[in-house]
Amino acid sequence: MTIVNVIAIDGPTASGKGTVAHKVADAVGFHLLDSGALYRLVALASDRAGIDLADVDALAKIASRLDVKFGPDRVWLQGEEVSLAIRAEAIGNRASAIAVHQPVRDALTQLQRSFRKLPGLVADGRDMGTVIFPDAPLKVFLTASVEARARRRYKQLIDKGISANIEDLLRDLEARDVRDRTRTAAPLRPAEDAKLLDTSDMTVDQAVAQVLEWFAAVRPDA
């Protein structure tokens, strides 16, 4: 049977998992899945359609019909590039609120699993190792202090020309952490066999090197 390796990288908002996942995928030549972008796309599409966050059926319908295309550092929704639009803090907060609904998560499950193709996949999100790819040979739970994450998110937004307030970001991250960890549908938590990686005082390259070292030790097709 053909082995399609998956490196699952989970963690809270602004923990650095997206950047680490991107660099790991480049290093090993695997495809990349940014699962958080899918929830942000549902958030953007539903916001544009004027759908209330409490209308779970309508949100799930949008998720099941998501017309999305990914490219290097770019994403398209129904043919429109929305790479910057989905990174707005308001859309991120809306995505976090949408992600608590099981019907939405169910609608996106098969779409996420369809990204598993040769030569392999690096998947980053919040439930990659616990729900979407529980058989991944390497599961990493990447985290950092909320203060470090707020500073990173602030820099990301400013670098993209998006105005931000670090105190507001800190409050938003704390609220999102509570929501992600306490939701009934796939709460944010490490898989039982996940490697824990605290990046509060690490550079991106150090975190990437650690993930690559772990993968080299467990890679079944090596």
Curated annotation (Swiss-Prot):
One annotated GO molecular function: CMP kinase activity
Keywords from the UniProt entry: ATP-binding, Cytoplasm, Kinase, Nucleotide-binding, Transferase
Location (main, coarse): cytoplasm
Residue numbers binding ATP: 11-19
Assigned EC number: 2.7.4.25
GO terms for cellular component: cytosol
InterPro entries assigned: Cytidylate_kin (IPR003136), Cytidylate_kinase_dom (IPR011994), P-loop_NTPase (IPR027417)
Class in the EC hierarchy, top level: transferase
GO BP terms: nucleobase-containing small molecule interconversion; pyrimidine nucleotide metabolic process
Signal peptide segment: none
Coiled coil location: none
CDD domains to which the protein is assigned, alphabetical: CMPK
Catalytic activity: CMP + ATP = CDP + ADP; dCMP + ATP = dCDP + ADP
Record's subcellular location: Cytoplasm
The family this protein is said to belong to: Belongs to the cytidylate kinase family. Type 1 subfamily.
NCBIfam families found in the cross-reference section: cmk
Record's protein name: Cytidylate kinase
